[in-house]
Amino acid sequence: MQLFDLWTDLLDLLTIVAGPTAVGKGTVISHLRKCHPQVKVSISATTREPRDSERDGIDYYFVTDEVFDCMVRSGQMLEWATVHGLHKYGTPKEEVERLLHTGQPVILEIDLQGMRKVRKILPAVRTVILLPPAWDDLICRIKRRGSESQDEIDARLATAKKELEAIGEFDYKIVNADVEIAANELWLAMNRV
């Protein structure tokens, strides 16, 4: 029996949360976890440098290109992609399996490419896209972060447009105009069967 066959029994616990850059995925998920601490979040691996507030093994597994490529070649990734044409991101299978076996709700915070790859393997997985109230809000949020160059901002916004065009691929759409409301809507979506 394959790993994914075992996961189908636990699929109701799994929710993919995606959305464009700077839409507030991490903020909404953090707020949700304050209200519902039993919710687990899979930690992704990435080849990008950590931002000032990020910690290895807590926010991401920060790895070199060589280590990431080795993880992909050895089949350790559930999904992976080069995002914004800049850095690689991926979801380690072992991490997701470990979290699912806790019997608690699990969130995968991944991008559109990752969602599509997971959905090919697990077609019934629940998917949620977080949306900005307006395009200009997204631009303001990414610039306010102050952690990307103009070229990186442009690449992220180009990717964001593509992600927003794919809104119909998601089961649930949540506008993040208010973090508390968005977190509550996410919780409700996670608990629909």
Curated annotation (Swiss-Prot):
Keywords for the protein's UniProt record, in alphabetical order: ATP-binding, Cytoplasm, Kinase, Nucleotide-binding, Transferase
SUPFAM superfamilies associated with the record: P-loop containing nucleoside triphosphate hydrolases
Matching InterPro entries: GK/Ca_channel_bsu (IPR008145), Guanylate_kin-like_dom (IPR008144), Guanylate_kinase (IPR017665), Guanylate_kinase_CS (IPR020590), P-loop_NTPase (IPR027417)
Catalytic activity: GMP + ATP = GDP + ADP
Subcellular location: Cytoplasm
Enzyme class at the top of the EC tree: transferase
Main location: cytoplasm
SMART domains hit by this protein: GuKc
Positions that bind ATP: G19, P20, T21, A22, V23, G24, K25, G26
Residues in Guanylate kinase-like domain copies: 12-191
EC numbers on record: 2.7.4.8
GO molecular function, one term: ATP binding
GO cellular component, one term: cytosol
Family assignment from sequence similarity: Belongs to the guanylate kinase family.
PANTHER family given in the database record: GUANYLATE KINASE (PTHR23117:SF13), GUANYLATE KINASE-RELATED (PTHR23117)
Primary role: Essential for recycling GMP and indirectly, cGMP.
Protein name: Guanylate kinase
Gene (UniProt): gmk
